[in-house]
């Protein structure tokens, strides 16, 4: 009986070490990719695990196509089932990294998420994927999770996807400070560049192809 117990304990230590390495890696990459302190004061405490289309596991800092990121992803972090969270996705490089005049573009915002159950949260902005303009180069995208003090009353009204108001120039720091959320408890960063799906999404959202 001792050997299986020791084996399980050893596996537990390995999993813990890998988790700590992942958490440290996402903090390092966010600093290297100039998220800290350009966009956030502090990095997330842990790596947010992101899976798109049930097949694509997001690796921090890697580049993916808008086609791969078109549907709302599944998220996983060390959530307290008794707590409420805010989940958001932003692009700080709109319309491009050299001239981010729309920083940050809000792609997703769900508040009052109980534990990991995003479907039971309150959507302020439904998810829509990356929209990097053609010839704009690579853009950064962040998905962040903040722990709320409790279930909160938010002033923000639900945003229409077809209306840029509220989506452009979204200030993450201002929003999270307003509701006293502190630093993100989990987060991840990835990149994307234009592909043929962008005109299709632009036409769906705004009635224009580019």
Curated annotation (Swiss-Prot):
Main location: secreted
Pfam families: PBP
Keywords attached to this entry: Secreted, Signal
One GO cellular component term: extracellular region
Listed transmembrane segments: none
Coiled-coil spans in chain: none
SUPFAM superfamilies associated with the record: PEBP-like (SSF49777)
Tissue: Cells at the bases of a few scattered sensilla on the posterior surface of the antenna.
Record bears the keyword Secreted: yes
Signal peptide: 1-19
Location relative to the cell: Secreted
Keyword Signal: yes
PANTHER family tied to this protein: PHOSPHATIDYLETHANOLAMINE-BINDING PROTEIN, PHOSPHATIDYLETHANOLAMINE-BINDING PROTEIN 4
Family note: Belongs to the phosphatidylethanolamine-binding protein family.
Protein name per the record: Putative odorant-binding protein A5
Species classification: Eukaryota, Metazoa, Ecdysozoa, Arthropoda, Hexapoda
Gene: a5
């Amino acid at each position: 009986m001792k050997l299986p117990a020791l084996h399980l304990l050893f596996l537990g230590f390995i999993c813990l070490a890998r988790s700590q390495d992942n958490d440290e890696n996402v903090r390092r990459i966010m600093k290297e990719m100039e998220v800290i302190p350009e966009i956030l004061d502090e990095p997330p405490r842990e790596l947010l695990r992101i899976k798109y289309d049930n097949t694509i596991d997001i690796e921090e800092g890697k580049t993916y196509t808008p086609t791969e990121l078109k549907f709302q992803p599944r998220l996983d972090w060390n959530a307290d089932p008794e707590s409420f969270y805010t989940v958001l996705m932003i692009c700080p490089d709109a319309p491009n990294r050299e001239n981010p005049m729309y920083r940050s573009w809000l792609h997703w915002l769900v508040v009052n998420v109980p534990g990991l159950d995003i479907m039971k949260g309150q959507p302020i902005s439904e998810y829509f994927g990356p929209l990097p303009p053609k010839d704009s180069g690579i853009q950064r995208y962040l998905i962040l999770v903040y722990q709320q003090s409790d279930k909160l009353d938010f002033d923000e009204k639900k945003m229409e996807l077809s209306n840029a108001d509220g989506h452009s120039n979204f200030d993450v720091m201002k929003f999270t400070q307003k509701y006293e959320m502190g630093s993100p408890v989990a987060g991840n960063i990835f990149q994307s560049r234009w592909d043929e799906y962008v005109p299709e999404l632009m036409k769906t959202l705004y009635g224009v192809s580019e």
